[in-house]
């Protein structure tokens, strides 16, 4: 079988001819006949995956002719299908000793794929341990062996065909054969077809593509002069021969075989090689004479053999000589050296096939030692792995089977470039395509000839035969015949290629046409192809995926073609596949017709618009009236509720409210008269000073009927309160909008006014001995009536004085604790503090009659009215714009419409954070459910268009929300009581407002609705502002469910139950889980869309889950902190890490343990379990596997390797440290699909559960995300991104140094210059980090690295540092973010050292090698590749 080719095609998907063969295998039993290196393994993998995903529970048995090939194919299957339960069954497992059915049942239990040699399966079936009915699929690698008495044919003859004849096709497995040589004659081909009950098949519709990947080598003859007959027959008739033939003991047999091998090596390679063989064999025997596992002879035989050979003379050879004459070799080997030295390929890689195992070892050693070849060729040897533990013929067997895998690996990775091997390497073994293949001995048959030739599959390669000049002619004629066959085959292929090219120039007229009536747009077959390619170019880009239409063809009996096109897997399955209807002479015409029908289907399913163009952001997704919105809007002035109240005073209906004032344990109260019922007002906490707070509670309003006299008295009382707290006389008008007074019966109000209005001279108050609790505010007339708080009287030197404290400033907002005044300390603490205590002459002062304990009401009135105004604005908003939302708690609305500029107790920033996620979630779900045909690209573009600030700004303006946004700042010093006379004649005006504020308030209201009444109320609020949003019916089945999904009992996914158990959710629609695990590169299942749509939905669901977790936390965080926390929890780094961590053990296949002493006791042992991960279940392209396995031999490092290295440090940081491990995450640089699959599974659970967020929360809790999130919240982990912190630190430092210039993070990509490519990318630190780095997309190879430079030119202008301070440079990073984080960490450390005064000009020196400043005095423990100033 052709191994997986080393060359990587530019197309990272299954080739068309491979898909043609795969689809043919689904229709019936076939034998795939394709050349070596054409990729038959891919076909087998596709067939195995299909069988597993449509499994009936039967075994898949893969038969390979040799042990190395079995091991190789099992490795390939395990790497490409990690979730499969598979194992090998080989002779080394001692299967011949498994003599009980219970042993076989235990071994095979739970397995899905078995790889073995044919003999193992034949023996098991012969003894009845494995029945043919238990097999679902039989794969025959190197199917041409299925003839005569070969075990493969015995399986078919003795078990398959009898069962087929007796029970029918349902009782036997499906057959897939793979071969590069189906036979040398038509009769042989028919025999193999009959034996395997299959039809030999080779690509027909895509033969031209197959020819592009298979290269016929040039056949060359290497002639040599044979040995003279007298030298060749030295052994015959010798004394040694007679002696050995006379005895017939086991030792004589060993010696006879040994001598025959030595003579063969002498004849083939020469005397030096024979002497080396004898010497090395004797040394090998003596060194392992008493090791049981190496030589299995009894004691006497061993002693006898050792005694003979230890006394025999051993040839002395010189292996270090530089003179070729010291290496006498045979003429045949001389011809080989001459041929090898004539090759001039600098990338030489070659194979030499020899006949005997012993000759392999000796020739390899001779080539690596001979002066002519040892410096040019790096030689290895390979004899296979069939060394049995019971082998007793060990004398002269020099090569250990344990060395074989190393030889092949060395050859694959270029550490060796020439391999000497037996025929074991001619079939299937995965080796690099060779430039030279040499048959040192003539192949024994046509199949061997073809198989050896298949190793020379590099372009312009050579296939050489070693032929004797004295050959009788028959052998040469035979190979000349074969050479002619090869030449004719090449010519036939060339003729076929020329015919196809000639047909390609034929211009067939494809007369298909489609017209869109609404626009007149026309689609024709002539331009359909470029339309289709353009559509594919607009699909979302993904690494490991090439988004382009894939065409395949079928050919009818008349040789005409019909095309089929398959679009990338991100396209809906309904339109992903299209076929032509007519038959054509040329592929060009067939492709045009298929492209026409494909594009027409895209239009019919709404994937292109009426202009027959892909939907774009500028047309379908965005309203035209939002693109022209300026950044600053002219909007309505803030709604003034006092205007409405001024008009309501004309009515006789009044309402009385009661305000309860609590201070410590003392309660007082006030009356509050309004012209209408007031909305509920939340209790207020007013901060008088650092130790004194008042709590105001409002009782419900009740209607009251007041006389004109009482209204006037309430106005007087209101004026009294307001005047009591200001030194400025009030205006004459007292028609206040709201009236305040003492909580007294109405008939006592006039008495209260008379008692408390006005003031008295301080001297008079002193004379009347007014009680201290009735003492009013002191006014210093010498200082314009400055207000003071009376403390005590002082009568010193006959002058009456007052000791007072300053009255709290009117500038202070009592709602804000940060502006608290300090309470007056104890008297013994202020004796030396004249700024606090005031001593005034009584003659300059007056004292108000209103007690100071009641004057505080005058300070409360502005605060009460300010909060009442906010409540009235919110109430009016709820009665108009939000009339359908029905908020329960008005405080949420007040918070949502209050700008930070207003400096109110709350503002919209926190609610905007919640609303943003709720909006994104709702719109994403709506788009997902209501547009089942749209791919992820359309969904993402539409989501961004609907939730962008411009759209929300337009929604706010359309609904008139601008008038209800509270921007007026409450300033107590400038505040004046609203008057009826002023408000009656107020005129409308406008104000300027940022468009972003309007958008933020919309999101804040959505957040307020979410907090007030949950998700349903929030979504009602969304529809109010964005009526185009159709709320999704999440309880209904997804509209795009495939017919497969109706069969819920069928296990469509490999090991699905195991996966569902660990996810913690059992899917009702199994295809949803398949879709969630289908990578966009998956080519073989056109009925399932890739996971991108579900990942789009899951991303929004995850945001919603984390936001709900943050909201429910007992500690309230500010908006900026919540944003950083959410980013730390849902970022792709953490999700990818948790995906890699999400592992569990799958029990390995059981293995019987045999007691080799008795060979009777069998114990079933369980090997270490196989580890499965979430990513093990990904369905992807076998032709370009995702990097899910560590291959250290390749010299490269993938994300899993880096994860294994950094995992302990990351876990320690996540569980113990106070800082988030941004640097460690960026160093892993995980591929995006690791995080994508987590989000796609969340999306799949959400859809399958009918929108149950709890089910999704259960999965992320199992994943470990909830635990990490709770620790971040509970322990206040610092989640600030290093680049943000570095920018802040640099800006602070620049400000302190008086520098105006900012700092810039400059990032560029650097390719290895040997690749001939170079890219440069400069990125500002504030740039958005996308899912993929721009330079990574389409990049190949590990040579792409990033360098980040942070210019410190601004600092160099400062005299404290001078010009010796150089820029910070970080090199060799795998991603842009990693480079910037590494540089940012150095900036943070550098700034700290600069500010501490430890780093100065005298400490700096220039690194000559790098040209970059380094700190000679600091131990900074930098990573390799990092230099710093």
UniProtKB/Swiss-Prot annotation:
Signal peptide: none annotated. The record marks 1232 as: Important for activity. Residues 21-200 form the Helicase ATP-binding domain. GO terms for molecular function: ATP binding; helicase activity; metal ion binding; ribonuclease III activity; RNA binding. InterPro entries: DEAD/DEAH_box_helicase_dom, Dicer_dimer_sf, Dicer_dimerisation_dom, Helicase_ATP-bd, Helicase_C-like, P-loop_NTPase, RLR_Helicase, RNase_III_dom. Its cofactor is Mg(2+); Mn(2+). Residues 528-622 form the Dicer dsRNA-binding fold domain. ATP binds at residues 34-41. One of its GO terms (biological process) is regulatory ncRNA-mediated gene silencing. Pfam families: DEAD, Dicer_dimer, Helicase_C, Ribonuclease_3. The keyword Ribosomal protein does not apply. Mg(2+) binds at residues 1095, 1236, 1239. Residues 874-1014, 1056-1250 form the RNase III domain. Keywords: Antiviral defense, Antiviral protein, ATP-binding, Helicase, Hydrolase, Magnesium, Manganese, Metal-binding, Nucleotide-binding, Repeat, RNA-binding. GO terms for cellular component: cytoplasm. Its EC number is 3.1.26.-, 3.6.4.-. A motif (DEAH box) lies at residues 141-144. Residues 335-501 form the Helicase C-terminal domain. Dicer-like endonuclease involved in cleaving double-stranded RNA in the RNA interference (RNAi) pathway. Produces 21 to 25 bp dsRNAs (siRNAs) which target the selective destruction of homologous RNAs leading to sequence-specific suppression of gene expression, called post-transcriptional gene silencing (PTGS). Part of a broad host defense response against viral infection and transposons. Belongs to the helicase family. Dicer subfamily. This is Dicer-like protein 2. The gene is dcl2.
């Amino acid at each position: 079988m052709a191994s997986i080719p080393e060359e990587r095609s530019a197309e990272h998907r299954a080739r068309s001819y491979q898909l043609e063969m795969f689809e043919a295998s689904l229709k019936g039993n076939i034998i795939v006949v394709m050349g070596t290196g054409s990729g038959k393994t891919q076909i087998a993998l596709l067939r195995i995956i299909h069988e597993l995903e449509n499994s009936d529970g039967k075994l898949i048995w893969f038969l390979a002719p040799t042990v190395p090939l079995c091991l190789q194919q099992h490795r390939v299957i395990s790497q490409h299908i990690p979730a499969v339960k598979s194992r090998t069954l080989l002779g080394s497992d001692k299967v011949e000793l498994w003599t009980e059915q219970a042993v076989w049942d235990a071994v095979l239990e739970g397995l899905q794929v078995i790889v073995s040699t044919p003999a193992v399966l034949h023996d098991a079936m012969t003894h009845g341990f494995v029945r043919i009915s238990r097999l679902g699929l039989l794969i025959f690698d190197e199917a041409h062996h299925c003839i005569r008495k070969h075990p493969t044919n015995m399986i078919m003859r003795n078990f398959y065909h009898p069962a087929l004849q007796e029970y029918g096709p349902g009782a036997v497995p499906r057959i897939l054969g793979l071969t590069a040589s189906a036979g040398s004659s038509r009769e042989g081909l028919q025999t193999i077809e009959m034996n395997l009950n299959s039809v030999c098949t080779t690509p027909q519709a895509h033969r031209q593509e197959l020819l592009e990947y298979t290269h016929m080598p040039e056949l060359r003859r290497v002639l040599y002069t044979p040995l003279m007959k007298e030298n060749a027959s030295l052994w015959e008739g010798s004394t040694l021969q007679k002696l050995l033939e006379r005895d017939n003991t086991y030792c004589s047999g060993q010696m006879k075989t040994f001598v025959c091998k030595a003579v063969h090596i002498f004849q083939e390679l020469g005397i030096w090689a024979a002497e080396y063989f004898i010497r090395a064999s004797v040394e090998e025997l003596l060194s392992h004479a008493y090791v049981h596992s190496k030589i299995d002879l009894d004691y006497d035989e061993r002693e006898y053999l050792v005694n003979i050979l230890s006394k025999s003379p051993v040839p002395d050879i010189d292996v270090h000589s530089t003179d070729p004459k010291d290496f006498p070799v045979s003429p045949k080997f001389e011809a080989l050296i001459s041929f090898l030295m004539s090759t001039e390929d600098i990338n030489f890689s070659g194979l030499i096939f020899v006949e005997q195992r012993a000759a392999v070892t000796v020739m390899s050693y001779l080539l690596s030692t001979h002066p002519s070849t040892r410096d040019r060729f790096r030689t290895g040897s390979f004899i296979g792995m069939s060394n049995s533990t019971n082998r007793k013929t060990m004398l002269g067997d020099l090569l250990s089977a344990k060395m074989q895998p190393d030889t092949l690996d060395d050859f694959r990775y270029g550490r060796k470039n020439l391999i000497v091997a037996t025929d074991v390497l001619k079939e299937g073994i995965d080796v690099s395509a060779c430039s030279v293949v040499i048959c040192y001995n003539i192949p024994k048959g046509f199949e061997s000839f073809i198989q050896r030739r298949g190793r020379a599959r590099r372009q312009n390669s050579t296939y050489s035969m070693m032929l004797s000049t004295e050959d009788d002619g028959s052998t040469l004629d035979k190979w000349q015949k074969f050479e002619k066959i090869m030449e004719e085959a090449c010519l036939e292929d060339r003729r076929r290629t020329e015919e196809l090219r000639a047909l390609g120039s034929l211009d067939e007229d494809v007369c298909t046409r489609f017209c869109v009536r609404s626009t007149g747009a026309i689609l024709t077959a002539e331009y359909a192809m470029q339309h289709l390619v353009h559509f594919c170019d607009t699909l979302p880009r993904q690494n490991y995926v090439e988004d382009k239409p894939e065409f395949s063809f079928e050919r009818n009996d008349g040789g005409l073609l019909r095309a089929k096109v398959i679009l990338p897997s991100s396209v809906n399955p309904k339109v992903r596949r299209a076929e032509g209807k007519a038959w054509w002479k040329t592929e060009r015409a067939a492709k045009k017709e298929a492209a026409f029908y494909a594009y027409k289907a895209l239009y019919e399913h709404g994937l292109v618009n009426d202009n027959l163009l892909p939907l774009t952001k500028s047309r379908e997704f965005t309203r035209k009236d939002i693109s022209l919105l300026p950044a600053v809007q002219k909007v309505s002035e803030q709604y003034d509720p006092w205007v409405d109240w001024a008009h309501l005073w004309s009515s006789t209906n009044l309402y009385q409210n009661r305000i309860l004032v609590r201070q410590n344990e003392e309660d007082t109260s006030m009356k509050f008269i309004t012209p209408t019922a007031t909305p509920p007002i939340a209790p207020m906490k007013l901060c008088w000073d650092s130790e004194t707070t008042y709590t105001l509670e409002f009782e419900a309003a009740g209607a009251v009927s007041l006389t004109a006299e009482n209204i006037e008295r309430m106005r007087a009382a209101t004026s009294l309160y307001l005047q009591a707290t200001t030194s400025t006389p009030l205006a004459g008008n007292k028609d206040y909008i709201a009236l305040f007074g003492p909580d007294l019966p109405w008939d006592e109000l006039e008495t209260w006014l008379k008692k408390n209005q006005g003031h008295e001279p301080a001297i008079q108050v002193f004379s009347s001995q007014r009680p201290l609790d009735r003492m009013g505010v002191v006014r210093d007339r010498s200082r314009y009536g400055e207000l003071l708080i009376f403390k005590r009287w002082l009568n010193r030197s006959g002058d009456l004085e007052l000791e007072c404290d300053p009255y709290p400033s009117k500038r202070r907002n009592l709602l804000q604790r940060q502006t608290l005044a300090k309470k007056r300390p104890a008297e013994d603490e202020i004796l030396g503090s004249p700024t606090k205590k005031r001593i005034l002459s009584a003659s300059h002062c007056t004292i108000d009659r209103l007690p100071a304990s009641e004057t505080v009401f005058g300070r409360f009135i502005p605060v009460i009215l300010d909060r009442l105004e906010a409540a009235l604005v919110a109430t009016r908003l709820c009665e108009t714009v939000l009339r359908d939302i029905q908020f329960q708690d008005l405080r949420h609305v007040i918070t949502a419409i209050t700008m930070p500029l207003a400096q109110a107790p709350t503002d919209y920033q926190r609610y905007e954070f919640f609303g943003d996620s709720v909006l994104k979630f709702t719109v994403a779900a709506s788009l997902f459910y209501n547009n089942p045909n749209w791919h992820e690209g359309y969904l993402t573009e539409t989501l961004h268009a609907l939730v962008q600030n411009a759209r929300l700004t337009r929604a706010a303006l359309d609904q008139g929300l601008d008038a209800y946004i509270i921007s007026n700042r409450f300033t107590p010093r400038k505040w004046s009581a609203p008057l009826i006379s002023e408000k009656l004649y107020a005129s409308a005006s406008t104000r300027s407002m940022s468009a972003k504020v309007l958008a933020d308030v919309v999101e804040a209201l959505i957040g307020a609705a979410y907090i007030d009444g949950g998700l349903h109320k929030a979504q009602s609020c969304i529809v109010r502002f964005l009526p185009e949003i159709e709320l999704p019916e999440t309880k209904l089945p997804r509209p795009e469910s495939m017919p497969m999904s109706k069969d819920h009992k069928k296990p469509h996914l490999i090991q699905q139950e195991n996966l569902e158990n660990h996810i913690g959710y059992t899917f009702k629609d199994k295809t949803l889980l398949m879709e969630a695990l289908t990578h966009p590169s998956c080519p073989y299942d056109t009925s399932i869309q890739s996971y991108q749509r579900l990942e789009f939905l899951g991303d929004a669901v995850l945001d919603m889950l984390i936001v709900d977790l943050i909201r429910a936390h007992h500690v309230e965080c500010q908006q900026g902190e919540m944003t950083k926390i959410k980013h730390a929890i849902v970022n792709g780094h953490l999700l990818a890490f948790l995906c890699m961590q999400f592992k569990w053990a799958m029990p390995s296949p059981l293995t019987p343990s045999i007691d080799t002493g008795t060979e009777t006791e069998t114990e079933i042992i369980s090997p270490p379990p196989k580890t499965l991960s979430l990513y093990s279940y990904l369905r992807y392209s076998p032709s370009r596997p995702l990097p899910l396995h560590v291959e250290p031999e390749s010299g490269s490092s993938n994300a899993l390797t880096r994860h294994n290295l950094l995992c302990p440090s990351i876990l320690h940081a996540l569980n113990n440290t106070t800082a988030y491990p941004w640097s460690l995450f960026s160093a892993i640089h995980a591929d995006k699909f690791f995080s994508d699959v987590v989000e796609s599974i969340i999306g799949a659970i959400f859809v399958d559960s009918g929108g149950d967020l709890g089910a999704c929360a259960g999965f992320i809790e199992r994943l470990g995300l909830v635990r990490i999130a709770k620790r971040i919240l509970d322990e206040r982990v610092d989640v600030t991104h290093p680049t943000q912190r570095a920018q802040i630190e640099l800006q602070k430092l620049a400000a302190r140094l008086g520098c105006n210039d900012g700092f810039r993070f400059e990032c560029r990509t650097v390719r290895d210059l040997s690749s001939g490519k170079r890219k440069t990318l400069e990125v500002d630190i504030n740039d958005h980090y996308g899912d993929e780095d721009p330079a990574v997309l389409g990049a190949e190879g590990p040579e792409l690295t990033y360098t980040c430079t942070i210019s410190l030119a601004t600092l160099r202008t400062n005299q404290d540092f001078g010009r010796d301070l150089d820029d910070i440079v970080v090199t060799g990073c795998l991603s842009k973010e990693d480079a910037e984080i590494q540089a940012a960490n150095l900036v943070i450390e550098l700034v700290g050292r600069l500010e501490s005064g430890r780093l100065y000009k005298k400490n700096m020196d220039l690194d000559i090698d790098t040209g970059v400043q380094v700190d000679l005095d600091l131990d900074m423990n930098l990573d390799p590749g990092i230099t710093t100033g």
